[in-house]
């Protein structure tokens, strides 16, 4: 099963389970949780079932395209079901079967691993899912988002698509993953992404102008707060996301000290909380 087919299979399966399929959000983000369809839609008492591919950027994890299993940008497949179905774990296991895995012939373990995002003011009870010793999925039951307790507990299922693909295709190097294949011609993950891994690593670790980025961070925060004064949660949240990504680039660049780090995280959390509160208020209008 190619990388593309894994995505198509998961989209089809979760659509059959009642999820709408939305598209990736057009802002850099460190994880699928940052998407408005998760962060904001987890709030309120309205049921919400959604699935989508989440391109994710973590600048500090870049390795110039030289590490066989570590990437500065990668893909998650995100599922949110609110409220959480009682059989969510069963639904997940059936999704693995849809991908061609015989779950009776593999060691599948749910390892307790409660999740927290300090920048988003979010946390939940959770488990890592290990497939024959390799983590492939994170399960989380959201308890709080943007510092606000969740009225309905959402189940978040986050697949690591590259890890699943490496397992399903029996590859030891992420760049050898078969992205697509037709008429005997193979396109690999490396064909699609290796150059970008090198160039973004070069930028994030060596070239990024820290003075400009520090100013961007402050400007994004100011704009977010200014928008929130008008009660507009969604455009404000865009600037919260930009501030978070800018922080991540500064962190990769080595420009943020240990003592500064907590201050930056608290600033982003304040923005995220403001967006969450504004969104929650909009639901009551």
Curated annotation (Swiss-Prot):
Q: Which domain of life is it from?
A: Bacteria
Name the catalysed reactions. tRNA(Gly) + glycine + ATP = glycyl-tRNA(Gly) + AMP + diphosphate
Which gene produces this protein?
glyQ
* Record's keyword annotation contains Cytoplasm: yes
EC numbers: 6.1.1.14
Q: Where in the cell is it found?
A: Cytoplasm
Matches recorded under InterPro entries: aa-tRNA-synth_II/BPL/LPL, Gly-tRNA-synth_heterodimer, Gly-tRNA_ligase_asu
Alphabetized, the UniProt keywords read: Aminoacyl-tRNA synthetase, ATP-binding, Cytoplasm, Ligase, Nucleotide-binding, Protein biosynthesis
Q: Name one GO molecular function term.
A: glycine-tRNA ligase activity
- Database matches in CDD domains: GlyRS_alpha_core
- Any one GO biological process: glycyl-tRNA aminoacylation
Name of the protein this chain belongs to: Glycine--tRNA ligase alpha subunit
Pfam families from the xrefs? tRNA-synt_2e
Q: Which HAMAP family match?
A: Gly_tRNA_synth_alpha
Name the family the entry cites.
Answer: Belongs to the class-II aminoacyl-tRNA synthetase family.
